[in-house]
């Protein structure tokens, strides 16, 4: 769906730019996935031992670290998109399309770190459906409809703007799931 929209509104240059943007984004996301997966045994063990303070502290630390890493990546992608794109291509037309796409697509990438960490947290404590929902929400549930809608109004920029919209809505959803979970856990601890 994304490649079709990119081809329709931006041609081959948009497809090439998307390959570069995806690579840049995945480099950042892979770091966060590694950190979040490292959190899982710590959270799982302490959750099973009913050491909820340790669980909260571990999750808090991972969210902070993930947000800082993604914040640095987000800043660099928005502030220096041409420089980043030059690591992949020296074609002037592709550089221009890629720089614009990087600036837009990774605009709110800072929130993706917490979204991934929260998703991995739910997997760690055995709430698989929430983890699965959060994992699918960013790249499917919110991205595809936004891309189809936004591209009709704004063309190629609409395809690009669907990514930060999806990232933001998925992060808000993750935080709402976490807030509700913490609230319900406090109620259980008081009983």
Where are these regions (language model features)?
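Alpha-helical transmembrane segments of multi-pass membrane proteins
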Residues: 20-28, 92-118, 145
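Short alpha-helical transmembrane segments in multi-pass integral membrane proteins
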Residues: 43-108, 149-191
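N-terminal membrane-sensor/transducer module of prokaryotic signaling receptors
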Residues: 6, 129-131, 149-150, 156
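Short runs within selected transmembrane alpha-helices of multi-pass transporters and secretion channels
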Residues: 32-36, 105-124, 130-139, 159-175
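Alpha-helical transmembrane segments of multipass membrane proteins
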Residues: 1-5, 27, 75, 117-121, ...
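Helix-terminus/linker motif at the lipid-water interface of multi-pass membrane proteins
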Residues: 1-23, 27, 45, 83-92, ...
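Small-residue-rich hydrophobic transmembrane alpha-helices
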Residues: 18-75, 79-81, 112-131
């Amino acid at each position: 769906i994304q490649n079709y929209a990119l081809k329709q509104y931006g041609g081959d240059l948009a497809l090439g730019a998307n390959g570069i943007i995806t690579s840049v984004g995945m480099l950042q996301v892979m770091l966060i996935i590694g950190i979040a997966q490292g959190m899982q045994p710590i959270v799982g063990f302490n959750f099973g031992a009913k050491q909820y303070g340790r669980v909260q502290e571990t999750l808090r630390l991972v969210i902070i670290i993930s947000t800082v890493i993604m914040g640095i990546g987000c800043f660099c992608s928005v502030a220096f998109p041409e420089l980043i794109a030059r690591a992949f291509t020296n074609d002037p037309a592709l550089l221009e399309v890629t720089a614009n796409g990087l600036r837009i697509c990774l605009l709110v990438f800072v929130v993706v770190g917490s979204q991934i960490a929260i998703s991995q947290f739910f997997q760690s404590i055995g709430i698989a459906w929430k983890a699965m929902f959060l994992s699918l929400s960013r790249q499917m549930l919110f991205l595809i409809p936004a891309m189809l809608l936004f591209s009709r109004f704004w063309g190629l920029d609409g395809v690009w703007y669907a990514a930060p919209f999806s990232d933001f809505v998925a992060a808000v959803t993750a935080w709402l799931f976490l807030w509700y979970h913490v609230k319900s856990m406090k109620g259980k601890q008081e009983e």
